[in-house]
Regions:
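Mid-to-C-terminal catalytic subdomains of enzymes
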Residues: 326-355, 363-474
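Amphipathic alpha-helical segments that form well-ordered structural scaffolds
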Residues: 98, 209, 213, 270, ...
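Peripheral terminal appendages
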Residues: 157-160, 200-201, 208-209, 213-224, ...
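ATP-dependent adenylate-handling ligase core
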Residues: 259-317, 323, 340-354, 374, ...
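Short, surface-exposed acidic
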Residues: 31, 90-95, 406, 422-436, ...
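Cysteine-centered catalytic environments shared across enzyme families
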Residues: 1-301, 323, 327
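An alpha-helix initiation/capping motif
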Residues: 96-97, 101, 116, 204, ...
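Short, amphipathic alpha-helical segments that act as regulatory/interfacial helices
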Residues: 6-9, 100, 104, 315-321, ...
């Protein structure tokens, strides 16, 4: 990952800019630079991924314009060729160098052209103004706010803006900002039509698009690794990558508790099958408890399930950073939002299933995508998410929801069937029931966190303290514990997150008071 910061106005202070940018130094430990545009500043912390030389350092400048971008542009070679045909020249191998030529040629229409995950802030000399934009899913983070004098700031993380802005707001995915307005250029959750097809043709399309999504994300000048939980999604990503890169073993990592890890054996089975160089990170109860506060500080959220699931990811990424030269990690996020969680088995009809999928994609930047970004970036690594490939997401979201519902006796059947003949991973893994990530790391992880919360507050203290919050009021001692840690680092900024992630409680079988799939009546053998 990298970090970007735009302090957009003549009232901007260089010293304040410097201190704010330093707060996300771990996102980009290789180099740091601040550019004075004459009307504010653009700042960049670099984690070198494409073109590791100094030529790839940002901000990029051209004809008085300037840009900083935290992103990966997967079609940059094709776009570069088009620009070169028009006479543009380039001095680096960085994918982001083409952004200013694109701006000169296409203006705001450039954002729709990008097959990318990105957050950027661009200074336009002609108008002496700033333009900001974020990818359609929100895989790369971006926040904004105004300082006490009303000067606008954009930043990779809310921590850059704490103490500067009284209100910090997530930049809406699929939008660009210009002249005081946020304009949607692509909405991945606005589905006006759906398409059908027979099962085999649909699964063939899913297969080819996911393989393409993995292939794009293997393109890196820095070493690549893989998070392998042993569940379907990460195992498929690893299996596809192993077939695409047969010349050398993948490097894979998994994590589990020292007492009751569920997924370690499954991850080991996949690693043996694909022949990866596999590493296991074993953690204790104390590791979990010690990680809680730094995890919430990194996440910038109080959401229960996001915090739980982040503990394992944070600790495994810390181990990767400390023991290897890997810079890029491929992960399995976003599959659940597209094909369904355990709770979506209870969707009353196809329309309800589709509406829930649209909601999950619309809000994913506050939950699973946020978790992957922060836990990985705080350890100076970059996350890449093949299931978040724009063509893949667009195709699946437009599929007839009847096809995606669990009519097959097992969830996510379309993905499973799509790869049934490839034999990329063991069939036992391909057809394995889903387990929640925090549960898969170890059932005791959730239990240990709840025990800590129960020991922290009496019932009277819980009632008194939770009553102090008028937004997203804590409803368990665990949720209160997370909220109080959040407020320590992000005071008064709770509205950055829309609500607690929970199953759709209006559906039969989903009226629960905990986000864990373990409390659902259909959890069955998922946790075995």
């Amino acid at each position: 990952m990298c970090a970007i910061l735009g302090y957009c106005g003549r009232g901007a202070s260089y010293e304040v800019m410097q201190k704010a940018l330093q707060k996300t130094a771990t996102r980009g430990p290789d180099d740091s630079r601040i550019l004075d545009t004459g009307n504010g500043f653009l700042g960049f912390n670099r984690l070198a991924i494409m073109d590791l030389s100094d030529a790839g350092m940002q901000p990029f400048t051209r004809n008085g314009n300037a840009v900083v971008c935290n992103g990966e542009i997967y079609d940059f070679r094709e776009l570069k060729e088009l620009l070169e045909e028009d006479g543009y020249t380039f001095t680096s191998g960085s994918d982001c160098e083409l952004l200013l030529p694109l701006w000169e040629k296409y203006g705001v229409h450039m954002f729709r052209m990008l097959d990318a995950e990105f957050a950027m802030v661009l200074y336009d000399k002609a108008s002496d103004s700033y333009i900001a934009a974020r990818d359609p899913i929100g895989i790369r983070p971006l926040y904004y706010g105004k300082d006490a004098e009303g000067t606008l700031l954009f930043a990779s993380e809310p921590k850059n803006l704490v103490g500067l802005c009284s209100k910090i707001t997530p930049f809406p995915p699929g939008h660009y900002y210009r002249d005081g307005k946020f304009i949607c250029y692509r909405n991945m959750s606005a589905i006006s039509y759906t398409t059908g097809g027979n099962l085999d043709s649909v699964c063939a399309a899913i297969h080819d698009r996911l393989v393409s999504g993995v292939r794009k994300r293997l393109d890196s000048d820095a070493p690549v690794g893989f998070l392998l939980s042993g569940g379907l999604d990460s195992s498929l990503v690893c299996g596809i990558a192993a077939k695409l890169m047969p010349e050398k073993p993948l490097r894979t990592w998994s994590i589990g508790m020292d007492v009751d890890a569920i997924d370690l054996k499954y991850a080991r089975e996949v690693a043996d099958y694909i022949g990866s160089e596999h590493h296991e990170v074993i953690i204790s109860k104390q590791d979990v408890l010690d990680a809680l506060e730094p995890v919430i500080a990194a996440l910038g959220t109080w959401d229960i399930t996001t915090v739980r699931a982040s503990i394992g990811m944070y600790l495994v990424c810390r181990a990767i950073h400390e023991t290897s030269d890997v810079r890029v990690l491929l992960t399995g996020e976003i599959s659940d939002e597209l094909f369904g969680y355990k709770y979506t088995d209870f969707a009353p009809d196809a329309k309800a299933f589709q509406q829930e999928a649209e909601k999950r994609i619309r809000e994913i930047h506050m939950y699973d995508v946020l978790r992957a970004d922060r836990c990985i970036a705080v350890n100076s690594l970059e996350a890449r998410v093949p299931f978040g490939d724009l063509e893949f997401v667009d195709y699946v979201m437009h599929l007839d929801p009847e096809l995606k519902m669990n009519h097959y006796g097992i969830g996510k059947y379309l993905v499973r069937h799509a790869f049934e003949e490839d034999e990329l991973i063991p069939r036992s893994i391909l057809m394995r029931e889903k387990a929640a990530f925090s549960d898969a790391v170890g059932h005791s992880l959730k239990d240990d966190l709840q025990e800590l919360a129960e020991q922290t507050y009496t019932e009277e203290e819980f009632e008194k303290k939770s009553a102090e919050y008028d937004f997203a009021k804590p409803f368990t001692r665990e949720s209160l514990l997370y909220r109080e840690i959040f407020e320590k680092y992000y005071p008064g900024q709770a509205r950055m997150v829309a609500d607690f992630w929970m199953p759709n409680r209006s559906w039969p079988g989903c009226d629960v008071n905990d986000p864990s799939a373990r409390v659902l009546p259909n959890y069955g053998k998922s946790g075995e």
